[in-house]
From Swiss-Prot:
It catalyses: L-methionyl-[protein] + [thioredoxin]-disulfide + H2O = L-methionyl-(S)-S-oxide-[protein] + [thioredoxin]-dithiol; [thioredoxin]-disulfide + L-methionine + H2O = L-methionine (S)-S-oxide + [thioredoxin]-dithiol. PANTHER family: PEPTIDE METHIONINE SULFOXIDE REDUCTASE, PEPTIDE METHIONINE SULFOXIDE REDUCTASE MSRA 2. Belongs to the MsrA Met sulfoxide reductase family. This is Peptide methionine sulfoxide reductase MsrA 2.
């Protein structure tokens, strides 16, 4: 019996020693607006170190906005994505680098075929993220093939999740998504802005 108690105690000690290794990784978030959140969500998913990408709304004055509120252009909100990532595998600077190549930062009237304030590009930052974002914007502006940088860097605000039917849209509606993306001219314009 005594031997069984010792073995049980040893097993608990081993399990306790490995508990930190089993703990969830520390995560951080980044919030980006870049026109249609379907496209931003799709293009940020699959980046190594990105754990989750969620479509939603931010930057406005209306609490709990709906898609209709946002696209009516009366709420002040942007269509945006919240990217949750593992900072041990991916840094914020790389996410910014990726972001710039997914948007036309020279267009402050919307993005591609989506027009209006809710479709403008913007980076929403915490105080710690601001200097990194500002430096990244300056570097990105030097690489533009056409136009001048107009994308704003704004203070992070409450992020409201979009309605369920907007989330993971590209995965659930592949044909509609790619028809929209192609018809909107997103990829063609990105080649003009960034080259390649």
């Amino acid at each position: 019996m005594r031997r069984l108690i010792v073995l049980f105690a040893a097993a608990l000690a081993v399990l306790g020693a490995t508990a930190p290794a089993l703990a969830a990784p520390k995560t951080e978030t980044a919030v980006f607006a870049g026109g249609c959140f379907w496209c931003m969500e799709h293009d940020m998913q699959g980046v190594p170190g990105v754990l989750k990408v969620e479509s939603g709304y931010t930057g406005g004055h209306l609490k709990n906005p709906t898609y209709r509120d946002v696209t009516s252009e009366t709420s002040g909100h942007y269509e945006a994505v919240r990217v949750t990532y593992d900072p041990a595998k991916l840094d914020y600077g790389f996410l910014l680098y990726r972001y710039w190549r997914l948007v036309d930062p020279t267009d402050d009237g919307g993005q591609f075929c989506d027009r209006g304030p809710s479709y403008r590009p913007a980076v929403f930052v915490t105080p710690a993220q601001r200097p990194i974002a500002e430096k990244s914007r300056t570097e990105a502006a030097k690489r533009l093939k056409t136009g001048t940088m107009k994308t704003q860097i704004l203070p992070a605000q409450t992020f409201y999740l979009a309605e369920e039917y907007h989330r993971d849209y590209a995965k659930r509606n592949k044909l509609n998504y790619f028809a929209y993306r192609t018809g909107c001219g997103r990829d063609a314009r990105l080649k003009q802005v960034w080259g390649g």
